[in-house]
Amino acid sequence: MGDERPHYYGKHGTPQKYDPTFKGPIYNRGCTDIICCVFLLLAIVGYVAVGIIAWTHGDPRKVIYPTDSRGEFCGQKGTKNENKPYLFYFNIVKCASPLVLLEFQCPTPQICVEKCPDRYLTYLNARSSRDFEYYKQFCVPGFKNNKGVAEVLQDGDCPAVLIPSKPLARRCFPAIHAYKGVLMVGNETTYEDGHGSRKNITDLVEGAKKANGVLEARQLAMRIFEDYTVSWYWIIIGLVIAMAMSLLFIILLRFLAGIMVWVMIIMVILVLGYGIFHCYMEYSRLRGEAGSDVSLVDLGFQTDFRVYLHLRQTWLAFMIILSILEVIIILLLIFLRKRILIAIALIKEASRAVGYVMCSLLYPLVTFFLLCLCIAYWASTAVFLSTSNEAVYKIFDDSPCPFTAKTCNPETFPSSNESRQCPNARCQFAFYGGESGYHRALLGLQIFNAFMFFWLANFVLALGQVTLAGAFASYYWALRKPDDLPAFPLFSAFGRALRYHTGSLAFGALILAIVQIIRVILEYLDQRLKAAENKFAKCLMTCLKCCFWCLEKFIKFLNRNAYIMIAIYGTNFCTSARNAFFLLMRNIIRVAVLDKVTDFLFLLGKLLIVGSVGILAFFFFTHRIRIVQDTAPPLNYYWVPILTVIVGSYLIAHGFFSVYGMCVDTLFLCFLEDLERNDGSAERPYFMSSTLKKLLNKTNKKAAES
């Protein structure tokens, strides 16, 4: 290695020279990347202005309440429709028109009603009976029965027929049900359309599907919501258990790092082994059972995931996946056993550092709070922007009309030329839009909103990384630990980051935000091109998405190490990124093995916590723990709380381990700098711990003499 060093250094910069005044993070530093700091402040001012404009023009009621043909809200308090929460379609069959997909509005009159119709009636029959008072509530407001039947139906004052309906998403849909495989409304398989002819119930089904294309998705969402309402208490208990396990693991790492790492490795192997055994037992148990040999391909997608657990092929797939993971982990442990010892020494050192800076374990809460603020501002601004359009009215006509889909004014339409040429046409509320400059810029404002979210979120993450790196670097470069540590290393690092390096953090976050917004645009274009048959375009899009994904991962890695250099030396972003990159390239073998081995060990720790809590949740929610068998709530889909607990447990474990991860990365870079700066002599002693020196066969001469 020593023979290669001069040539290797020439390609990737020169090693750090010994500096007798260097004692860790530099305190006398200046502001860096001031221009980027100014740009960030201006962008935040612009972002606030966009939010104010959106909140001024936006109206979230458009998302919550349905609107009638006049653009008035149904069920909103303080309006004339306060007691009319449901939207009623005069002729829902019209919703099957392709115009719905273009205008997002059914070409039929719509009014707000107190309740959906519960009986079958035609206007022709109800007009001359006592049912007319009931029927009239489904006519346009202010309707007076002083017209002929044909004129009333032609003007769209009343629906031709009422069909028993049920409310769904505040809209009235036909109460269609199946009896012995036959679709029916009430006791009928056909209905009279009010014009003297009878139509099939399937016409209503098509109209209802187009009027609410997410019917099945909403039903699935409602079942999932029901599961959450009865299981949220147990989900929280599961997450608390995950938090307690993570905290206990971190505390044990502080005192028993080496033992805990080996216990963690063995436990992961045992957990995977038990998973393989359980899958095999289930696979064997299903042998010979009726329907268990159906293939996953033949079964297709099912919303009830319990169906898959009755198939042998499902458990075979699980067993193969777990076996592959088990073999990979065992092989990695065999070939990397020597490097694992050094990685354990780094983790031990990180445990000591975290022990001296215990408040660092609470810093993820600060990052979480700031990220929640970013998400809340972005989401609220997006909602207000999307609802800041004005009511647009368009011409609808069942018969051919040259003015169909043209904009109109409902107040002047009755006396307009369009009304005279198309007597059956109606000027009806179509959607929310607008023709002003602000409305034309809405798409751009939404993109700006998303871009600022990425920029600010990455800035918050960068601030956390620089803060933790500064605190842990103070620990490493303290020759006499903990005597040479500053009083409040975390708060000092946080203050330095905000005071001197806001611009550098903004620069790194900006680069990452640009790549991320490009990835979002590529995803949007990919969705638009899915229907296209151009194979070249699809291939190009896939390549671009892959390249930008790799670029984002590389930039995140480079930024992380650049922030460590910023925390230590106080240099600007570009200089820090270059120095960090060259330092890592000069020690590429150690980076590829040591740093990644520690990441792998932390991943095993997360898997141990997530796997343990996930298995416990699985046995609890599937009523397999006899002691609490009657306590577990009945569920539509038991995978809902299980997946929630698993994902939540991973996020909690990741939050705790991220502090350790940043500590290890910081100590690793400091360790590499230490090897380049110092040689172990009395004048240039190593700052690394005695354990690391022993593993690397390094000694401080002064210590050896004593």
UniProtKB/Swiss-Prot annotation:
Transcription regulation keyword on record: no
Family: Belongs to the CTL (choline transporter-like) family.
Species this protein is from: Homo sapiens
UniProt KW keywords: Antiport, Cell membrane, Glycoprotein, Membrane, Mitochondrion, Mitochondrion outer membrane, Phosphoprotein, Transmembrane, Transmembrane helix, Transport
GO-annotated cellular components: extracellular exosome; lysosomal membrane; membrane; mitochondrial outer membrane; mitochondrion; plasma membrane; specific granule membrane
Protein name: Choline transporter-like protein 2
TM regions (residue ranges): 34-54, 233-253, 257-277, 316-336, 365-385, 458-480, 505-525, 564-584, 600-620, 639-659
Compartments, record wording: Cell membrane; Mitochondrion outer membrane
Glycosylated position list: N187, N200, N417
pH dependence per the UniProt record: Optimum pH is 8.5.
Single annotated GO MF: antiporter activity
Membrane topology classification: Multi-pass membrane protein
Cytoplasmic compartment spans: 1-33, 254-256, 337-364, 481-504, 585-599, 660-706
Reaction catalysed by this enzyme: ethanolamine(out) + n H(+)(in) = ethanolamine(in) + n H(+)(out)
Residues recorded as bearing Phosphothreonine in the entry: T14
GO BP of this protein: choline transport; ethanolamine transport; phosphatidylcholine biosynthetic process; positive regulation of canonical NF-kappaB signal transduction; transmembrane transport
Signal sequence, renumbered to the chain: none
Alphabetical list of Pfam families matching this protein: Choline_transpo
Oligomeric form and interacting partners: Interacts with COCH.
The organism's taxonomic lineage, starting at the top: Eukaryota, Metazoa, Chordata, Craniata, Vertebrata
Tissue: Present in supporting cells of the inner ear (at protein level).
Extracellular side: 55-232, 278-315, 386-457, 526-563, 621-638
Source species, domain of life: Eukaryota
